[in-house]
């Protein structure tokens, strides 16, 4: 974070600029003066290093990554300038001294430096503390921007050099399938016709970024990318002035929210990613896919198989702030954003498609569309496309008006010469897309196909993908809430006095009888509890939304904590009571159909083990087959990674998910039903995080089958989708992996699979025993956790609209079982143990190997584990993720957090167990992989993590010091703010949070 006395001598340009010391003159003035000085000089730009002539071959990894580290140093210097300018030399010197001392401690293992660092941090005033924390936090953010830029840069270099397609691209997947003989045109065509891929955006309580910060970072990323282009000296100086201004904006912008985020805020945050990335990049991805298919001899327009989903505004599980009103707010804001996009694009098309029928013909359908337009201007009488588009625009505006109200979406005049009209609204988005297709077809028939490529084709694709709703909103609620509402309806209706107390068989009998009866349970003459009115109100609003915006707007209902068949049937009954269920269930000629698919969410280890039995019993119920037929013989099942991890640990969670998936595949194949799995993955490895590409490819054979939904958790949405180029790459990765996993499932079914699975079962049993012995069976562990991590401080942070825990208000009755899995994982990350991503593996491997009767057998078991790593993607991905987590852990830093535990005996007992298991795990991983250094297979990530530590360490040390003061009764507002700033900075530095 050194202050740059002069501007960086850029590697990308022949001319370098210089500037006076940062504190001597305002940056903008210095940049302007520099530009004037160099204006007229021989500032001929040189080709950037990524020009077409550049070849990636023959260069070392260090050479390839040098631009990344130059960018990090450059941004660090800019930040140093800003700190000195804004806070003065004294604060800058403190920050720089802490940085240098932390680097010395980290790189040289200098114990004296560690003691010096601790003394310095203890002496900081609350004001200095906040400045130091902000400086190190923003450095982490800027380093992330530089890394993202470098990923884009490297991809472009490969493309310019004509390198082979990279893993994670559709082109690579097609090449791989072709080589394996799995890529006939018919097979590929069938895949896309039957595919459904849906990333589902969620708002989780560990998303720590403010939108204002994200906006500034977006500008910094754009300006940094500009520096890869050939720039004149004046342009370079101007670029630096703008970069300096945006870094200054960051410094002068409040990093934390003053008030807890509302659901409305979460809705707006998510919508910002549509504007920045999805609206443009998703249609572009479709075009890329069709181009890749064409290169493989398949020229076809793929259907709208890739769509977007959302939980924001519909996820009520544990969040009383989500209601019918927030559901309404979510769909209204989503619709407003997509209508604004459509209207803007149609308006621009009207300006661009100046095609005259005096020069080229037009189809009869296009002429009819133009004739129906309200535009009667004599200046456009020969311009049928413009006239047609004015008609489309007025109908779009009317469509927005009837759905959202007058004035909700900005609308332009229909054009000069066109009187204000009240056009006929489109019945649905399909009708809008059909009009666009008329324009496209006419252009294609009259030598104008290229005119559709820049804007019309992406707009038509957007209409197919986003409809009038933008993203499908899932509803989610806990099964115990459904039971309470159903029990109330049955009791008030005189059907069953105490439904909740009934055994499962009797519950099903009562539910099926109610579903077979056309009469509703609800009466307008009876009063119901606030809970019942709220829950039924959400479903009633969903019914209205489907009528207003189309069935795709709300089509799924997730049932958290599904433990029995009645948990599913209860939601069918609630749909019946709110108009979402038609006909009667299980009666002849009843034509039963449910508007929302009921989707079980299996979360705990026990529930995962019971998943296939529950679904088998559900399918066997009278009338359910008819419901499935209405759903196209498809059924979705959601699997929870977070709670299963908290319940059974990292290894067992992954293994039980694997087993549950295979059991479900067998059942669904037996019943002739198509299975779609919905993966509830989080940001951390402990919650199913890690590289999406490898995660999908490591799924058990037959479990992907062209269809997949997966959560994009709030805390990693920014890192994946804030940058449009990286956003498109991440979206393509999901498509490529799904394509490979579907058409080449044998790659995850090695010859020795039965032996591998038997070994995994043994490992899982031992790992779960080890994990639960620590977390659930160690006396005092709950106290240790709450003392040694910032969990209570995280709960105070204004991060999300949902509370961190269901039952944490009373410290005397705190239980790990009651803590939500997300802040559980988040807290372990903050203290640099990341326990949820590795604990239990070392003990499991040790038990497996020690269980061998002799040395020869032990050798065979080691060989088997090594072969599992080399030939079984499931196991290899598991170890790769664990390797990454271990690289981010730091036992020395974690020991500082352990000091927060007042009970010395408890502290020593628990921490020593964790340390011993860490070493066992690291040793086991080394024995299996043969790599003793962390991330040996991913040197760029290894260097990235290593270079972050000197900036992360001070944040951790400061966090411990501030927590000590806070818990000792210091009520200084700056101290509390400092704690929350460290939480933000550490999360940014680790690049995955909850």
UniProtKB/Swiss-Prot annotation:
Q: Which UniProt keywords apply?
A: Carbon dioxide fixation, Lyase, Magnesium
Return the GO cellular component terms, semicolon-separated. Answer: cytosol
Keyword Transmembrane attached: no
- Catalytic reaction(s) noted: oxaloacetate + phosphate = phosphoenolpyruvate + hydrogencarbonate
State where composition is biased (Low complexity).
14-25, 41-54
Keyword presence, Magnesium: yes
The UniProt entry, under InterPro entries, shows: PEP_COase, PEP_COase_bac/pln-type, PEP_COase_Lys_AS, PEPCASE_His_AS, Pyrv/PenolPyrv_kinase-like_dom
Residues of the active site are: 204, 646
- GO annotation, biological process: carbon fixation; oxaloacetate metabolic process; tricarboxylic acid cycle
Question: A Gene Ontology molecular-function term?
Answer: phosphoenolpyruvate carboxylase activity
Cofactor(s) recorded for this entry are: Mg(2+)
Q: Which SUPFAM superfamilies match?
A: Phosphoenolpyruvate/pyruvate domain
Renumbered to this chain, region (Disordered) spans 1-66
Task: State the top-level EC class.
Answer: lyase
Recorded E.C. number(s)? 4.1.1.31
Similarity annotation? Belongs to the PEPCase type 1 family.
What is the role of the protein in this entry?
Answer: Forms oxaloacetate, a four-carbon dicarboxylic acid source for the tricarboxylic acid cycle.
Protein known as: Phosphoenolpyruvate carboxylase
From the broadest rank down, the organism's phylogenetic lineage runs: Bacteria, Pseudomonadati, Pseudomonadota, Betaproteobacteria, Burkholderiales
Gene of this entry: ppc
């Amino acid at each position: 974070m050194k202050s740059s006395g002069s501007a960086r001598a850029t590697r990308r340009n022949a001319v370098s600029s210089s500037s006076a010391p940062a504190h001597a003159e305002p940056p903008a003035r210095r940049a302007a003066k520099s530009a004037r000085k160099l204006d007229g000089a021989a500032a001929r730009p040189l080709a950037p290093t990524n020009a077409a002539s550049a070849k990636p071959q023959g260069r070392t990894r260090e050479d390839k990554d040098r631009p990344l580290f130059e960018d990090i140093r450059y941004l660090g210097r800019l930040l140093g300038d800003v700190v000195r300018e804004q806070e003065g030399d004294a604060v800058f010197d403190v920050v720089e001294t802490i940085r240098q001392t932390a680097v010395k401690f980290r790189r040289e293992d200098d114990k004296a430096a560690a003691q010096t660092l601790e003394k310095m941090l203890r002496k900081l005033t609350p004001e200095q503390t906040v400045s130091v924390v902000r400086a190190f936090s923003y450095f982490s953010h800027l380093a992330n921007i530089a890394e993202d830029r470098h990923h884009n840069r490297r991809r472009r270099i490969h493309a310019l050099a004509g390198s082979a397609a990279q893993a994670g691209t559709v082109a690579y997947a097609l090449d791989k399938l072709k080589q394996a003989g799995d890529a006939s045109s018919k097979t590929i065509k069938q895949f896309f016709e039957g595919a459904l891929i849906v990333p589902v955006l969620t708002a989780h309580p560990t998303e720590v970024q403010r939108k204002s910060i994200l906006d500034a970072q977006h500008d910094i990323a754009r300006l940094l990318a500009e520096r890869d282009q050939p720039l004149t000296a004046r342009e370079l100086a101007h670029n630096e002035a703008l970069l300096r201004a945006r870094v200054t904006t960051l410094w002068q912008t409040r990093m934390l929210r003053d008030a807890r985020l509302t659901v409305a805020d979460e809705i707006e945050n998510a919508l910002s990613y549509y504007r920045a990335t999805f609206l443009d990049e998703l249609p572009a991805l479709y075009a890329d896919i069709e181009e890749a298919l064409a290169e493989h001899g398949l020229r076809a327009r793929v259907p709208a198989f890739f769509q977007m989903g959302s939980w924001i505004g519909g996820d009520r599980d544990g969040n009383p702030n989500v209601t019918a009103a927030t559901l309404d707010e979510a769909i209204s804001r989503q619709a407003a954003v997509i209508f604004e996009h459509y209207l803007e694009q149609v308006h621009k098309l009207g300006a661009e498609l100046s095609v005259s029928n005096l020069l080229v013909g037009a189809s009869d359908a296009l002429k009819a569309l133009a004739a129906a337009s309200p535009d009667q201007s004599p200046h456009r009488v020969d311009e049928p496309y413009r006239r047609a588009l004015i008609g489309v625009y007025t109908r779009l505006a009317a469509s927005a008006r009837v759905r959202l109200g007058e004035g909700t979406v900005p609308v332009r005049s229909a054009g000069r010469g066109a009187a204000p009209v009240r056009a006929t609204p489109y019945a649905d988005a399909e009708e809008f897309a059909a009009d666009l297709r008329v324009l496209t077809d006419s252009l294609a028939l009259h030598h104008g196909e290229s005119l559709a490529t820049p804007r019309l084709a992406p707009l038509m694709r957007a209409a197919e993908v986003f409809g009038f709703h933008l993203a499908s909103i899932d509803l989610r609620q806990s099964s115990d809430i459904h039971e309470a509402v159903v029990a109330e309806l049955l009791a008030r209706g005189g059907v069953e006095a105490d439904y909740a107390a009934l055994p499962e068989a009797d519950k099903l009998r009562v539910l099926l009888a109610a579903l077979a009866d056309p009469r509703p349970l609800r009466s307008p003459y009876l009063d119901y509890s606030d809970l019942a009115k709220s829950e039924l109100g959400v479903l009633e609003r969903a019914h209205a939304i489907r009528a207003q915006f189309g069935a795709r707007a709300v089509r799924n209902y997730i049932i958290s904590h599904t433990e029995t068949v009645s948990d599913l049937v209860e939601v069918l009954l609630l749909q019946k009571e709110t108009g979402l269920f038609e006909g009667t269930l299980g009666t002849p000629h009843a034509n039963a159909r449910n508007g929302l698919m009921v989707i079980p969410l299996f979360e705990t280890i026990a529930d995962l083990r019971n998943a296939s039995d529950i679904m088998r019993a559900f399918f066997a119920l009278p009338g359910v087959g008819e419901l499935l037929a209405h759903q196209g013989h498809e059924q979705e099942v959601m699997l929870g990674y977070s709670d299963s991890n908290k319940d059974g640990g990292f290894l067992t969670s992954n293994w039980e998910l694997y087993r549950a998936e295979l059991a479900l595949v067998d059942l669904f194949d037996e019943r002739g039903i198509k299975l779609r799995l919905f993966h509830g993955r989080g940001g951390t490895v402990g919650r199913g995080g890690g590289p999406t590409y490898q995660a999908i490819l490591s799924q058990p054979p037959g479990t992907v089958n062209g269809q997949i939904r997966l959560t994009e958790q709030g805390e990693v949405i920014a890192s994946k989708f804030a940058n449009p180029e990286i956003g498109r790459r991440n979206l393509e990765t999901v498509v490529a992996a799904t394509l490979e996993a579907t058409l080449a499932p044998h790659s995850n079914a090695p010859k020795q699979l039965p032996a591998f699975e038997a070994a995994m079962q043994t490992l899982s049993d031992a790992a779960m025993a080890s994990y639960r012995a620590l977390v659930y069976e160690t006396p005092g562990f709950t106290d240790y956790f709450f003392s040694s991590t910032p969990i209570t401080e995280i709960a105070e942070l204004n991060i999300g609209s949902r509370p961190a825990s269901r039952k944490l208000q009373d410290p005397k009755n705190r239980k790990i079982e009651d803590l939500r899995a997300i802040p559980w994982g988040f807290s372990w990350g903050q203290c640099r143990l990341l326990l949820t991503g590795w604990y239990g593996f070392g003990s499991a491997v040790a038990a497996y190997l020690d269980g061998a009767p002799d040395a020869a057998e032990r050798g065979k078991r080691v060989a088997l584990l090594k072969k599992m790593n080399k030939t079984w993607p499931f196991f290899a991905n598991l170890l790769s993720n664990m390797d990454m987590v271990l690289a981010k852990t730091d036992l020395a830093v974690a020991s500082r957090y352990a000091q927060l535990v007042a009970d010395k005996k408890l502290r020593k007992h628990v921490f020593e167990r964790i340390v011993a298991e860490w070493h066992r795990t690291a040793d086991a991983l080394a024995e299996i992989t043969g790599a003793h250094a962390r991330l040996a297979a991913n040197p760029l990530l290894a260097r990235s993590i290593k270079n972050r530590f000197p900036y992360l360490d001070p944040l951790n040390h400061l966090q411990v010091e501030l927590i000590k003061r806070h818990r000792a009764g210091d009520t200084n507002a700056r101290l509390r703010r400092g704690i929350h700033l460290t939480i933000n900075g550490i999360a940014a530095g680790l690049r995955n949070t909850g």
